[in-house]
A protein has these predicted regions:
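A detector for short, charged/polar N-terminal pre-domain segments
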Residues: 1-6
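Short basic helix-loop element that most often maps to the first helix and adjoining turn
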Residues: 9-28
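Hydrophobic alpha-helical segments, especially transmembrane helices
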Residues: 16, 23, 34-35, 51
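DNA major-groove recognition helix of helix-turn-helix/homeodomain DNA-binding modules
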Residues: 49-65
């Protein structure tokens, strides 16, 4: 994924496929509903800890891949 808009769209798609509302997701991840709204909108100024909580609740595995040659 290249930017936060893609991340936000992905999170929204997964959330909806699981039948979870933004409010339900925010409660399960212990973040504010506004955070979920802004995340799904692709807002750039996100707190990484909260992002990781949301991804965890949705069962999304975040992987970091080293560049070739490192």
């Amino acid at each position: 994924m290249k930017d936060m808009k893609e991340v936000g769209a992905f999170v929204a798609r997964v959330r909806k496929s699981q039948g979870i509302s933004q409010l339900e997701l925010s409660l399960a991840a212990d973040v504010g509903r506004r955070f979920v709204v802004e995340l799904e909108a692709g807002k750039e100024t996100l707190q990484s800890g909260k992002l990781l909580k949301v991804l965890s609740v949705l069962g999304i595995d975040l992987r970091l891949v080293e560049p070739k040659g490192v």
